[in-house]
Regions:
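Ligand-binding pockets and gating/stacking loops
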Residues: 1-410
């Protein structure tokens, strides 16, 4: 979508020139398959973006595209884990948790880290994608959902009077203090107490932040709230902006639910790239573009970093028999694109290159460790110095690797 390869279209129907059979998830290497979407140069920058995302394409001058991302895995769950935490195994803190731990919160009434999942379900690996791992529990993400109850069980099932609630909370606070003192300031207990105290404050903040009635009709229209195709992502993008305005440090939106099913409710286009990606792109294109416009209009884009990522890309060859050009594509961890916009990156630019057909990164490959190190740098944090002692090791988000990608910095 962001890496134009005219040579791929020219070589449509030919075999991938490779001495060794490609290492891919399902192992079926069909013939090369050109893009289903037209590419054009966009804006003053001339950045190449395909018609898959027509609205985002019109904001090309805001984007900083990395075309040479590489991952450690071509399997959804470990690939998601490494993109979120830097490790293929679960149990490690996510990027949002590290930022919460390192920078703290800018608000007492909302969490520092919020996740807004797709209405169709969560990603592979579930909550491990936004886990606080071995960091203190208060740095775990809080999930907000659409509908009348963004946070489950935030209010009592049976309403009680204000007086009864106040007296109950006072007693609970007293008991918590005594229990904490007797435990020797146990960190897990302290995190649980803080989480429940935050939940009490969220009884006021969550209904307010999730109420869009004060938003102008033009804003709701821009985000696509009246269109059933874009409504879910539109609501979440708008909620994300409202959360950022109120001091939430890191907001993470997921596009796509579980990978199983037919038709798939995710981007996992093994059967048909054109059919699948058209449906999924239509759900998010308009809301994401509206979010970029809204942040810029409000003067927020200068100090907000927008990340548009995927755990891996798709192969330039079809997922089919060796002599066919099938409609689907397999997973590609060797070279794919992500983009950033906003705080501290160079707008209207592209960094890195894949080979002539978009199979592997050949210039300035960027690992997830590099990607995370760069994000930390943009937040004013040295990724090598933000550590937490666990199980005999000073752990960090980037493990023992990671270099800041200076070529994308403004």
């Amino acid at each position: 979508s962001y890496d134009y390869k005219p040579e791929l279209s020219k070589q449509q129907g030919k075999s991938l020139p490779a001495a060794v059979k490609p290492d891919i998830f399902f192992g079926k290497v069909g013939l090369l398959r050109g893009s289903d979407w037209e590419f054009r140069q966009r804006g003053e920058s001339g950045l190449w973006v395909s018609e898959m995302f027509p609205e985002i394409a019109r904001r090309a001058d805001m984007l900083t595209v990395i075309r040479s991302m590489v991952s450690d895995s071509a399997n959804h769950t470990p690939a998601l884990f490494v993109s979120n935490s830097g490790f293929q195994a679960n149990g490690f803190p996510s990027l949002g948790s590290w930022l919460s731990f390192g920078l703290g919160s800018e608000t007492e009434s909302l969490p520092a880290y919020v996740v807004l999942p797709d209405a169709r379900g969560g990603p592979n690996g579930g909550a491990s994608n936004w886990s606080s791992g071995f960091l203190p529990g208060e740095h775990q993400a809080v999930i907000l959902r659409g509908g009348d109850q963004p946070v489950r069980d935030l209010f009592p099932a049976t309403p009680i009077s204000k007086l009864a609630e106040r007296e109950s909370l006072s007693l609970l606070q007293l008991l918590n203090k005594k229990h904490l003192a007797s435990s020797g300031q146990d960190q897990q207990l302290l995190a649980r107490i803080r989480s429940y105290e935050l939940a009490g404050r969220m009884q006021l903040s969550v209904p307010e932040v999730s109420d869009y009635s004060a938003e102008p009709e033009s804003i709701r229209e821009a985000y696509g709230l009246q269109d059933p195709v874009t409504e879910d992502m539109g609501r979440r993008c708008l909620l994300g902006r409202r959360l950022l305005e109120r001091g939430v440090r890191f907001v993470q939106l997921f596009s796509g639910g579980p990978i199983a099913g037919s038709p798939r409710a995710s981007w996992d286009a093994h059967e048909s790239v054109k059919d699948n990606h058209t449906l999924e792109a239509n759900r998010i294109d308009r809301p994401v573009a509206a979010l970029l416009d809204d942040l810029q209009r409000r003067g927020m884009l200068e100090d907000t970093l927008v990340l548009f990522t995927t755990e891996f890309g798709r192969t330039p060859f079809a997922q089919s028999d060796a002599d066919k050009v099938g409609p689907g594509r397999d997973h590609n961890r060797y070279g794919f694109s992500c983009w950033m916009a906003g705080g501290g990156v160079r707008p209207g630019s592209a960094f890195g290159e894949t080979d002539e057909v978009g199979w592997k990164a050949v210039k300035d490959p960027v690992s997830w460790n590099d990607f995370h190190a760069t994000i930390m740098h943009l937040f004013g944090v040295d990724h090598r110095k933000l550590t937490f002692y666990h199980n005999g090791i000073q752990r960090r988000l980037t493990n023992v690797a990671g270099n800041v990608v200076k070529g994308i910095l403004a």
